[in-house]
C-alpha cells in the first residue's frame, strides 16, 4: 500500500510529463495585434451603425411630432366648424324665403340663435352676460363708461356687448357700463 501511494496513476504521469497540454488547457489562445485591431474595428462599426440608426429614429420621431402638431393646428377648428354648418344652413334658408310675416321671421332667427348657442356650447364656448347689479369683474368685463347710479359702486349698470370664453379663457370680455363711486 505504501508503494501504491508513492507512484502516481498513469493519467497523472502523462499530464505531468507533457507541459504543453497543461498550458493550453489553462490559458486562452493569444491573439495577434492584427486580430485585436480587426475585432475592435468590427465593434466600432457595429456601434457606429447602432448610433446612426438611433439618430435616424430620433429624427423621424421629431419630424412626425412636428407634422402631428401642424395637423392639430390646421384641423383644430374642424369640430367647431361642423357644429356651425347647420347654423349657416338655417341662415341661407331664411334668406331664400319670401316671408312677409315679421313674427315668423323672428321665430326663425330665435331658432337659428339657439342652434348657434348650441354650437358654441359644443365647442366649449360660453357667453359672458353679466346681470345688472353684478359686481364688476375685470377678468371678464371691460368697463366702457362709469355713470352715476343708485347702485353700489363698481357694479354693472348695463351690458353693451356680451363677452365669450373658450374653455375658461376669455375670448372677448363683456362690454359694460359701471356705477360711479358716490
UniProtKB/Swiss-Prot annotation:
It comes from the Bacteria. GO terms for molecular function: adenyl-nucleotide exchange factor activity; protein homodimerization activity; protein-folding chaperone binding; unfolded protein binding. One of its GO terms (cellular component) is cytosol. Homodimer. Keywords: Chaperone, Cytoplasm, Stress response. It comes from Polynucleobacter necessarius subsp. necessarius (strain STIR1). This is Protein GrpE. PROSITE patterns: GRPE. Participates actively in the response to hyperosmotic and heat shock by preventing the aggregation of stress-denatured proteins, in association with DnaK and GrpE. It is the nucleotide exchange factor for DnaK and may function as a thermosensor. Unfolded proteins bind initially to DnaJ; upon interaction with the DnaJ-bound protein, DnaK hydrolyzes its bound ATP, resulting in the formation of a stable complex. GrpE releases ADP from DnaK; ATP binding to DnaK triggers the release of the substrate protein, thus completing the reaction cycle. It is found in: Cytoplasm. SUPFAM superfamilies: Coiled-coil domain of nucleotide exchange factor GrpE (SSF58014), Head domain of nucleotide exchange factor GrpE (SSF51064). NCBIfam families: PRK14139.1, PRK14140.1, PRK14150.1. One of its GO terms (biological process) is protein folding. Belongs to the GrpE family. Pfam families: GrpE. Residues 1-35 are annotated as: Disordered.
Amino acid at each position: 500500500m505504501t508503494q501504491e501511494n508513492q507512484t502516481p496513476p498513469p493519467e497523472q504521469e502523462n499530464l505531468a510529463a507533457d507541459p504543453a497540454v497543461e498550458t493550453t488547457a489553462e490559458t486562452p489562445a493569444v491573439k495577434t495585434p492584427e486580430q485585436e485591431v480587426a475585432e475592435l474595428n468590427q465593434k466600432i462599426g457595429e456601434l457606429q451603425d447602432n448610433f446612426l440608426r438611433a439618430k435616424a429614429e430620433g429624427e423621424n420621431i421629431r419630424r412626425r411630432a412636428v407634422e402631428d402638431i401642424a395637423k392639430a393646428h390646421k384641423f383644430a377648428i374642424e369640430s367647431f366648424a361642423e357644429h356651425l354648418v347647420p347654423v349657416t344652413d338655417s341662415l341661407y334658408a331664411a334668406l331664400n324665403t319670401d316671408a312677409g310675416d315679421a313674427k315668423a321671421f323672428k321665430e326663425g332667427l330665435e331658432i337659428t340663435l339657439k342652434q348657434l348657442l348650441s354650437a358654441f356650447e359644443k365647442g366649449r364656448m360660453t357667453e359672458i352676460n353679466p346681470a345688472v347689479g353684478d359686481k364688476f369683474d375685470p377678468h371678464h368685463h371691460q368697463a366702457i363708461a362709469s355713470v352715476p347710479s343708485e347702485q353700489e359702486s363698481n357694479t354693472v349698470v348695463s351690458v353693451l356687448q356680451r363677452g365669450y370664453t373658450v374653455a375658461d379663457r376669455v375670448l372677448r370680455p363683456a362690454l359694460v357700463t359701471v356705477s360711479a363711486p358716490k
